[in-house]
Amino acid sequence: MAQYALEAGVSWLATSVSVVASGTWQFAKWTHKYVMQQAEELEADEPEESYFQQMVDKEKEFHNYVRQQIICMWLFMLLYLFAYWLISRLKRKTEREALYAGEEDYFVYRVSVWISSTATATSIGSLTLLPFSVIGVELLQLYDGNYYLQWLSYSLIGALWNYVFVLSNVSLFVLLPFSYFFIESQGFSTSKIGNDMTQRIYEAMAISFLFAFVLLCLAEVVLTILDYPVSFLSITSVNLPLIYSCVSFIGAVLLLISTPYGFAKMFSLARDFLVTEETADIEEENSEQSEDVTEPKNSSSDETIHQVDRSDTPHLEDVVNDITENVDADGEFRKDSDSGIESGSTEEMRLNTDDEEMGINDSDDKSAFGDDGDLGNSTPTKNKKKRRKHDYAATTPIVRKWDKDVPKKPKNPNFDYRNLKEYVKEARRQRSSLSESDDYWFGSPPRSSFSANYYSSRFSRWKHNSETGLNPSSSLLVDPFASGDFHEASSSEASSTPLSPARRTKSEEAIWKPVLHTVKSSKLYKRAIEKQGRLVKLFMSLRFPVAAAALLVLTTCSLIMVATNTLKLLFGYRSLPVYAQYIEVHTRHSFGLFGACIETLLIIYVMITSFVGLYSLPVLRSLRPVRKDTPMPTIIINSSIVLVVASALPVAVNTVGMTTFDLLGSHSSLQWLGSFRVVVAYNTLFVVLSVAFLFNQLTASMRRQIWKWICQLRCGIRRESDADETIEILRGDKKSN
């Protein structure tokens, strides 16, 4: 019995232990599971936040990419429109082309213009790429996070370099050859596939392919001679930068010749444009002065013609007032309601344009005759052609303020002769407002009463303004038929009336001739002209030295930078142009924004001189474009040359050390940039050629004078020796006789 109780207790104890153990294990499992779930939940929160941050970054990157592409597209569109306008200004009309044969050729020429515009836009982008990058990087580093510079970024600058590289290759190797051969093509005559235009496209594509194959074979021969490991005929080893490297090297060689020659050519161009015009202006001024000097000799004839004493010559202020009044009153026009023909109402309308040099009108000419019809002391004039007079009402004689019957007006202290042009413009505006009024043409009162009332009103207004100290050029808008009286309008109302270009006729010039003649004969006008002439003469004499000094400073700075870069390369202070994948901080200029601007100015100057020298070379001089007379094949050739030079310009400028900006994209991976000998030789030749061309240009006139003096000296010695020989021969003849 005890044995059974012991066994039951042991079994119960074992069962209890197993239950407790299983419960403990289950509790441990539940605890472990709960703890693990909490840990997983904590870990799950962190990936969601990081995932959200990644999505935000990707969204920003996408928006930046879209904005970058939009900016690149707009820049290309602007450059394309400018290039298209430039080509349209240069090219000859399609109907005048030698190869133009009909409407089919019109489409061909349109396509060629589009392709040439694309290539020219790429060239302009390549030229402006380096200055834009230098200034852009400097602005980004100076004003980091600026609101107005959010559109500008390092990725945008790098994308522009990549796009220029791709478009340059596509335009140079695909588009321009196809455009040239497309104009020259006539179509395969034996093929029956497609129409004539399709056949011309096929022919142009075939010839372009053959042309590219010939170029590859020639390049292969050159590489074989140079023992270059890469072969162009091996398609797997040829990449686009290698092909572009050869083209850029050709462009760099052209720049090596044209830029130093352009340095010297800029001085001769400045001399041609400035010195020649200066001499012409001085001669014209001297002729005017001689005319002014000869005027007092004919004073008696002038008095006879004008019936005015020189002592009574009006002041310039009175002349200006007379201008405003004569133009408003006597310079009127009447319109024939039946024919719509505008005709003048004064005697000066019948003057011929040949009489403008005389500066006098018909009424003044008539005053020169005596009662018996004889001509007095007046100078002879040209014979006037008889013209049919208009059948209109009798003309009204011109009344001038300086006539003896009219009382003299006092001077206005506020008058300024330098505002003569403004006074004249105001008078024209007032006359235009009168002539455009409908009431002015129909139902107008008699002319005599209108002129008298108008002159009295204007004289009273001038007197009131002179007493109150107002400017005589204050506007007066006259409406003579509004409520039967005159009224004055504000200056804003008068200035709002536009000047009708149709009113500027030959009759107006005839009306103004006597007035302008009197203005030019006044002492105040002559004094002002003399003062202005001295200033103009001073400017004419200083503009060429200033321009030559500016060119000399820019050229000297460029050559000093190239020489310094050569010495740095030789002594190891500067490495060769290396591949730069990203824009780094060391691209910032050491002198800040001012240094970047100076560097950009030098780059632009080198760019201009390179193209001036390029089109001044004897070989390329014949390809120089002419406005509205350049054939389309010549435009395509010019586009190709400009594209080659423009693509090599950033590489050449960086090679000679005119910029510290690293070449981006595939431009810095060119093969010849890694050769130390080539880079040093390029810098040395650039300096030597520049100095040689400048020395030749600046000392050419002196050398010509020295050679001329030597030739004259030799000729004089020869003449003396010949004379001595002749004398000896004559003496021998006398002795023999």
UniProtKB/Swiss-Prot annotation:
One Pfam family here: LMBR1
InterPro entries reported in the protein's UniProt record: LIMR, LMBR1-like_membr_prot
Domain of life: Eukaryota
Stretches with biased composition (Acidic residues): 280-293
Disulfide bond positions: none
Biased composition (Basic and acidic residues): 303-318
Region (Disordered): 280-416
Assigned GO CC terms: plasma membrane
Gene Ontology biological process terms from the UniProt entry: signal transduction
GO molecular function terms attached to this record: transmembrane signaling receptor activity
UniProt similarity note: Belongs to the LIMR family.
Name under which the protein is recorded: LIMR family protein R05D3.2
